[in-house]
Structure formats: C-alpha cells, structure tokens
Amino acid sequence: MSHISVLLFETVESLLADRTTGVYIDATFGRGGHTHLLLSKLDENARVYAFDKDPQALEVAAALAQEDPRFTIIHASFADIKEKMQEIGVQSVDGIMADLGVSSPQLDQAERGFSFMQDGPLDMRMDNSKGLTAAEWLLEVEEEDLANIIYQYGEERHSRRIARAIKQAGKLDTTAQLAEIVKTAHPKWEKHKHPATRTFQAIRIAINKELDDIEVFLPQAVDLLKPKGRLSVISFHSLEDRLIKQFIQKESTLTEDSGWGMPQQQVDTRRLKKISRVRVSEEEVKANPRSRSAWLRVAERLEQKGA
C-alpha cells in the first residue's frame, strides 16, 4: 500500500491561514505528501524545512530538494528541532506541522519489522542506523518493565500475561514469532482487531521514545513560532492526542500565582490560542482505513503575553 497523507488539505490550510509566503517546517516529512501540497501553495520566496530520521524518507526528501530550491531536508528527530534550526540560522518560523503516524511503507515493508501482518526481522526502529532493534530490546528489558510498557503505551489490559509469555519465549527474531506469542497469550480478541496490535504499538513507542520526543518537541515548536504562527499536529492514538491536548491547554490557560500571604492572582503566561480540533472524515476513512483514528489539533502563537 502506498502512503496516503492523512488530513492533507485540512493540515496545510490550517497551517497557512491564507498566507502564501513565509518559513515553514514539516517536522515529520515521511513520504512528503504534506510538504508537496504546502510548497504548491507558497510563492517563490517561501522556505520549507523538513525533518525525518527514516532512511527511505530521507531519499525521497533529497530528490525533492534537488527539484525545488525552496526546500531543505534535515536528518534529525523533531525532538532536536530548535537546535537544528538555530544551527542553520533560522530563529523563527511562520508555521510547523507534524504527522505523528507511522507511514504505510514502514508498516508494509516486512524488513522494517513494524508489522504483525507480515513476517520480517523484529526491528521496529524508525532510524535503523542506530539503537537497539525490538529483538535486542526484548532480550534486555525486565518482565515487569515490559508489562508496564505494554499496559501504558499499548493500553493493553492483559499486559502481564503477555509480558510473561514474551520473556519465557527467550530470543525472538521475527515479527511473526512475536505476534504468535501474543496471540496465544491473549485470552480474548477484540472484533476486527489483531490481538498483537496493542503490544506492537507499545514496543514501537518504547524503542523509538516516541512520546518522550513529542514532549520535547512541542515546547520547542512554540519557541520557534512567530506571533500568529500556527502549530498543526496530527495524532493517531489517544496517548499522543492526550499529550498534545494537555500541552495546548497548559499553554493557552492563565496560571494562578499565590504570593506568600497574598490572595491568588492570575498570571498571564499564555503562548498559544486554540484554533481547532478536526477529526478525519468518513470519506477519508473509506478511502484510507488506516486514517480512522486520526485527529488534527491546531493552535496559534499569541502576539504577546496576554494578547
């Protein structure tokens, strides 16, 4: 299955807010769907920078950079967005978008080791040039820690039973082996959902530090935004969406300050204004079933504190 960009038009339109020029960042280039559309709507003076650490995504991005001088790809995690932009002399931008989902090519290529539907080496690394593979990580992790990770990151109620079965199995080399162990250990299957879905998600999140990276990325993104600059982020599961929701809520809410012996006063430290929350349409889900859980949250940088 080729990669289909989710919430494509909604994301780019929310990011631009009727502008046709400026400096923008695609924090998760993937296969470039959002970036291509963004570039098509910008004038010749605009600049678009993109981040990715997936080798195949970087190949696609390098080809685009050859075609379009307005575009630059940066081989790095979006968790390093502020440092990397400052290294190239960019202190502020007009908009930042991020699509937090795993791309279809990553899921569909068995050799990447993300999918329980196809047999392949048990890898799951976004950047397969460094770090532990899922197979190596599963050998090292303690059973209790694994159970907690499957419960927390996979929201899997049967995490302890599954973790015990995985650790008892010893060395695992393929996704099919792991999927079979989870399937056997799982006492009850959800309708239309493979029993290994939540466990694979949890392991992928853990070895790629996905939620940690999101927590680091969000405040840096706001630091980089110019006044009225937009932040548009697509999430695909409740853990991601909750982080984004809580961050935007915190950055758009007055805080209480109670000085010693003094009545509480509201202090305006707001940096963001909520713009919208958009759910993927039924039509898009029919065309691309993998988009079914997608949400887009959009916020705008305030001009100044209390603006």
Curated annotation (Swiss-Prot):
CDD domains: AdoMet_MTases. Keywords: Cytoplasm, Methyltransferase, rRNA processing, S-adenosyl-L-methionine, Transferase. GO terms for biological process: rRNA base methylation. Pfam families: Methyltransf_5. InterPro entries: RsmH (IPR002903), SAM-dep_MeTrfase_MraW_recog (IPR023397), SAM-dependent_MTases_sf (IPR029063). S-adenosyl-L-methionine binds at residues 32-34, 52, 78, 99, 106. One of its GO terms (molecular function) is rRNA (cytosine-N4-)-methyltransferase activity. Belongs to the methyltransferase superfamily. RsmH family. Its EC number is 2.1.1.199. Specifically methylates the N4 position of cytidine in position 1402 (C1402) of 16S rRNA. This is Ribosomal RNA small subunit methyltransferase H. SUPFAM superfamilies: Putative methyltransferase TM0872, insert domain, S-adenosyl-L-methionine-dependent methyltransferases. GO terms for cellular component: cytoplasm. It is found in: Cytoplasm. It catalyses: cytidine(1402) in 16S rRNA + S-adenosyl-L-methionine = N(4)-methylcytidine(1402) in 16S rRNA + S-adenosyl-L-homocysteine + H(+).
